Amino acid sequence: MDLNKEWEKVQEMAFTSWVNSVLEKRGCDKISDVSTDLSDGVKLIYFLESVSGKKFPKKFDLEPKTRIMRVQNLHLAMLFIDEDLKIKVQGVAAEEFVDNNKKMILGFLWTLYRKYRISVINEGDKSSEEGLLAWCKKTTEGYNNVNITGFKSSFRDGHGFLALAHKYDPTVFKYDEYEGHDNIARLNAAFDFAEKGLGIPKLLEAESLSKGNVDERSIVLYTSLFFHAFRAKEEREALEASQNSLNNKLASLEQSLEGEKHSQEELVKQKKDLEDALNKIREQNDNRNSRITDLQSKIDDALRGLDDEKLAKLDLESRLAKCEKDKAILELKLAEILDEKDRLEKKIDEDKKRAEAERLGLGLIRQHLAAQFSDIHKWQSFLEHPETVPYTGTPVDLDSELSSLSFEEQAKKLASKLESENILIEKYLNGKEEAKAAAKK
C-alpha cells in the first residue's frame, strides 16, 4: 500500500473515532463514514460547536431533504469556521461534502485536528509537533531501548509505543518481557495494549511502520492519541479525587448527624452544597470557556475601576493642594490680624498712660489755680479790711514776697502769675488737639 493510501486510511479511522467521541458527549448518533455521514451539515455543525465551545450563530435546517438545503447548511458551517473560529481551510467548499469527496473532507478534518488536538499540546517551551515529541521523550524517560528523537525513526522498533502503553498502566503487562520479541511483534503488542487499555484504535500497520513505510503525519496523529489519552486519564483522576474528597466530606457529615447535636437543617444544607459543588465539578469542562470570558470581562472592569480611582485621586490631590494654599493665605491674614491686635493694645496702653498723665497734670493745674484764686480773694478782702479777711476773721497771711511789695506791684505780680498759668493751660489744650488730629490720620 503506498503512503498516500496508508495516510488516507489512518485519517479516516482516526477522524471517525474523534468525531464520534465528540458527538457521543453531545448525545448525537455516531457516524460510520466521514465521507458520507457529514454530507447534510447537521452533525458537522454539532461537531464544530462542541469542539470549539462556541454557539453556532445562525439558524440551519435540521432535516435537509434536498441538495440545496444540504449545501446551504454546509455553507453556513464554512462561514462559521472562517468568521467565528478564524480557521482558514483552503480549497474546501460545501459541495465537497455533498459530493462525498473523501480526500477533501479528510484534509478539512486534518486541519481541524491540528487546530484542536495538536496545536494545543505544550511541553516546556515547545508546542504542536515539537511539544508532542518532547512529551513522548519525557513520558518514556527511564525505559530501556527508548530514545525519542523524531517521529519517523524513534517508533519503528515498538519500544516507544510499548513504553507509552506501559506508562499509562504498569499493571497490565511487564515491559521487560518484550525485550526478546522482534519489532513487528513488539509493535503489535503495543497496538493491542493501546486499543484495550487506552481506547486508541489500531491506525498503523506494524510491518509497514517497522520498515519505515508510514507517512510521518500518520505517526504524529497516532502518537497524539496517546497524549490525549494521558490527559483524559489525568482529568478523570483529578475529578475522581475531587469526588472522593467530597464523598468523604459527605460521609463525615452523615457521621456527625449521628454523633452530634447539630441542626438537622444546617447539615442538610451543607450536604446539598457539597452535592452542588460535585455537580459543578462534573460540568467544569462545559463551562470553562464561559468562565474565561467572564474573567476577562471582570479584568476589564477592574482596569476601568483603577482608571476611575486614579482620576478621583488626582482630583482629591488637586483639592488638597487648593486647601493647603487657602490655609497658607488664612495663616498670613491671621498673622496680620495678630500684629494689628498687638499694635492696638500697645496704643491703648500708651493712651491710658497719657490720660493718666493728663489727669495728674490737670490736678496740679487745679491746685495752682485754687491757690491763685485764694490769693485773689484774700487780696480783695485785704483791700476792704486791711487787717483781717472778712469771711474768716483771721489775719491775712500773705506771701512774704507779696507783703514786701506795694499794692500796684502786688497786683502786677498776681496778674503775671495768672497769665503764666493761662499760657500753660492753652499750651496743654493745643497739644491735646494736635494729638487727636494725628490719631485720626
From Swiss-Prot:
GO BP terms, alphabetized: adenylate cyclase-activating G protein-coupled cAMP receptor signaling pathway; aggregation involved in sorocarp development; bleb assembly; cell morphogenesis; chemotaxis to cAMP; cortical actin cytoskeleton organization; mitotic cytokinesis; negative regulation of protein localization to cell cortex
SUPFAM superfamilies: Calponin-homology domain, CH-domain, Coiled-coil dimerization domain from cortexillin I
CDD domains from the UniProt entry: CH_CTX_rpt1, CH_CTX_rpt2
Intracellular or extracellular location(s): Cytoplasm, Cytoskeleton
GO molecular function: actin filament binding; alpha-catenin binding; protein kinase regulator activity
Family per similarity comment: Belongs to the cortexillin family.
Name the UniProt record assigns to this protein: Cortexillin-2
Primary gene name: ctxB
